[in-house]
UniProtKB/Swiss-Prot annotation:
Database matches in InterPro entries: NDK-like_dom (IPR034907), NDK-like_dom_sf (IPR036850), Nucleoside_diP_kinase (IPR001564)
NCBIfam families recorded: PRK00668.1 (NF001908)
Organism of origin: Acidovorax sp. (strain JS42)
Source species, domain of life: Bacteria
The protein, known as: Nucleoside diphosphate kinase
Quaternary context: Homotetramer.
Residues reported in the UniProt entry to bind ATP: 11, 59, 87, 93, 104, 114
Length: 141
């Protein structure tokens, strides 16, 4: 198994609930290491650029509005099968359909305010990690 990196964002709803530490504990318990992390308040332009793949979708404006509504915690996670492992930890996009014990089942309020974002594939992860952590500020351990 290869070591991968993936991007995770703890969204404004979960940051406001003060559950960052509980979510980090789940990453670490699953064998994922936090290789880089920072808290930021996205600008509209940053959110639109990051979610540009969804630009033509009907939910794009609401997604951008939500993502700029408060600070987010962004982290690059590293470990074996990091992309899949993080997606399993997150659970289904709709928290009502998320398996019990997943991050979204435990901390999300709705399909929009669903606590976390995670890269959906290794290729996407590379682009997303580079978006938030350009250069050499990621540290393998």
């Amino acid at each position: 198994m290869a070591i991968e990196r993936t991007l995770s964002i703890i969204k404004p709803d979960a940051v406001a609930k003060n559950v960052i530490g509980q979510i980090y504990a789940r990453f670490e318990a699953a064998g994922l290491k936090i290789a880089a992390a920072r808290m930021i308040h996205l600008s509209r332009a940053e959110a639109e650029q990051f979610y540009a793949v969804h630009k033509e979708r009907p939910f794009f404006k609401d997604l951008v509005d939500f993502m700029i509504s408060g600070p987010v915690m962004v982290q690059a996670l590293e470990g074996e099968n990091a992309v899949l492992k993080n997606r399993e930890l997150m659970g289904a996009t709709d928290p009502k359909k998320a398996a019990p014990g997943t991050i979204r089942a435990d901390f999300a309020d709705s399909i929009d305010a669903n606590a976390v974002h995670g890269s959906d594939a290794a290729e996407t992860a590379q682009v997303e990690v580079a978006f938030f952590f350009p250069g050499l500020n990621i540290y393998s351990r």
